């Protein structure tokens, strides 16, 4: 792996020394409303240099840890299956090397490629999802590989009771009916996350964390393809990240920043800060991981 010309701030470790490997999937070909998430990874890297590596929230510095930024994958925008296969291959390589794969999207469909790799190594995988949308449609306009269907496709891999969703405030009736039978859905906020995390810690099951940034309220994060009013605050998301990363997290992703949809740059700055805090929270917990 070769580093990108411009890496995320503080992610300057070599691949050999790294415990976490950051890789980008600039893909948004199934976006159903406003495109632009393909530009998210590059924008986050570029704007990160306006951010300190030190986190006053966690009293830790990114430079205290070993993170390697491998840059973006070259993905075929005309083929979702091809793009997912490339994402899966990179995640599988990182997992095989005993490292933690952290995927930077892109639209939420990219999660499926990473989960495919994770479930090969961890058949008992659980998924924790922070999102405004249920993403449980069986198809969207006839397409089964869509960001509106990503958690439904993940459910086909991990089964009932293994998907735990938070902040959900949008979806059609069929999605909510499906969730009532097959997933654990917490609407609107992070109520129940502490209790779930305690259960996951006690059972020591492997957990994949997927964060769709549209879980945030659009008043602080308007730069996303499908904004939904009524979301959580940055501090609520940070608290949730610090809570859930005490579980046995074995892979993660951060997705759905569409930087061109917020010309103020606030959304990109927020995404940078979320990524910094996520990296630190994950790396602080690394000795407890069962990779």
PLM features per residue range, with description:
Residues 1-291:
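Conserved alpha-helical scaffold segments that buttress catalytic/binding sites
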């Amino acid at each position: 792996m070769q580093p990108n010309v411009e890496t995320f701030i503080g992610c300057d470790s070599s691949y050999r020394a790294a415990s976490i490997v950051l890789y980008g999937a600039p893909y948004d070909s199934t976006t159903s409303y406003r495109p632009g998430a393909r530009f998210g990874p590059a924008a986050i890297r570029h704007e990160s240099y306006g951010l300190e590596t030190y986190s006053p929230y966690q009293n830790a510095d990114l430079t205290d840890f070993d993170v390697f930024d491998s840059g973006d994958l070259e993905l075929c925008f005309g083929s979702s299956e091809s793009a997912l296969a490339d994402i899966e291959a990179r995640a599988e390589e990182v997992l095989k090397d005993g490292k933690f794969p952290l995927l930077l999207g892109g639209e939420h469909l990219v999660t499926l490629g990473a989960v495919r790799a994770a479930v090969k190594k961890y058949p008992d995988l659980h998924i924790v999802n922070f999102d405004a949308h249920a993403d449980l449609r069986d198809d969207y306009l006839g397409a089964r590989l869509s960001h509106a269907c990503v958690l439904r496709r993940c459910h086909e891999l991990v089964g009932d009771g293994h998907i735990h969703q938070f902040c959900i405030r949008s979806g059609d009736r069929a999605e909510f009916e499906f969730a009532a039978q097959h997933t654990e859905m917490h609407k609107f906020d992070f109520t129940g996350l502490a209790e779930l995390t305690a259960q996951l810690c006690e059972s020591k099951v492997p957990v994949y964390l997927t964060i769709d940034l549209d879980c945030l309220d659009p008043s602080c994060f308007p730069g996303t393809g499908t904004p939904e009013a009524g979301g959580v605050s940055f501090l609520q998301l940070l608290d949730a990240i610090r809570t859930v990363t005490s579980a046995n997290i074995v892979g993660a992703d951060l997705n759905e920043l569409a930087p061109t949809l917020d010309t103020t740059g606030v959304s990109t700055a927020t995404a940078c800060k979320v990524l910094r805090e996520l990296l630190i929270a994950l790396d602080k917990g690394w000795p407890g991981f069962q990779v």
